[in-house]
Amino acid sequence: AVWGDYGQNLEKKPVGIYGITREGELRLLFEFPAGAVRHVHGFAPRLAGGWYIFTGDMEEMAGIYIASGDFSIVEPLAVGDQRFRAVRGYDTPEGLVYATDSSIIKNHVYLLPDEDPSSLRVLSETNGPCIYGTSCDAGYLFSTTVEPDERVRGMCSYFSTSVGPGVQTRETQLLLVNRAAEVREVSRLKKDIYPMKLMQYGSIQFASGQERRSDVVCFCRSLKGFDAMPVEMEVK
């Protein structure tokens, strides 16, 4: 298992990546220097071996890195832009398929080739930021999240129902990217009426280990008629 530091990191401290050995020992595998990234969003295994690393949040700190299997080598692939702010991604023979997680601009599903990041390709627009996804028999699922407006501060932010600029509708959108990199919408579920910061963001989350399944198990949170409900859906 590998994971990275995630927090506000207002002091712009170094950000570590950690792993557990087979003997159960915790190790620091790599450390981004102070000010390089705010935190680590996630990882995706590469078909060629090693990892993609997703970091956030703002401009120069948002990026996608390539790491060797033991994290002895970590190099930037595409950094310094909200187009490279991601949490979930999946490697394919054509490149990395990922959805952006920006609360301040319109979000998209992209295809990013390793050999030529300048050939970044838009596969689809989404209605909001994406932090959840899973692979399944039909391809790759991404779900968007109904997030609050981060410009609302203090105690008022806990009761605000205003959404961020990157959230286009008050719905969680479920998108499928098939093996041919074609995108279609599977479903949309409406956010409930309650404030997001106090009562959770509207989201669809996924169980792990569904790579070969066509019936996908997910968990709905803060969605009208589906709050705190596990759901099984057929995805073809």
Please report, for each region that a protein language model flagged, where it lies by residue.
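Entry beta-strands of beta-propeller and related beta-repeat scaffolds
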Residues: 1-3, 49-53, 94-97, 139-142, ...
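Repeated scaffold domains used in trafficking and secretory/extracellular systems
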Residues: 36-42, 81-93, 124-139, 193-209
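Short loop/turn segments that connect beta-strands within beta-propeller blades
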Residues: 21-25, 68-71, 113-116, 179-181
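Structural motif
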Residues: 10-18, 59-66, 104-112, 149-175, ...
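A short beta-strand motif characteristic of beta-propeller blades
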Residues: 27-33, 73-79, 119-123, 187
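Loop-centered beta-sheet repeat module
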Residues: 33-79
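Blade-level signature of beta-propeller repeat domains, shared across WD40, Kelch, NHL, RCC1
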Residues: 201-236
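Recognizes the extracellular SEMA beta-propeller fold with strongest preference
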Residues: 1-24, 29
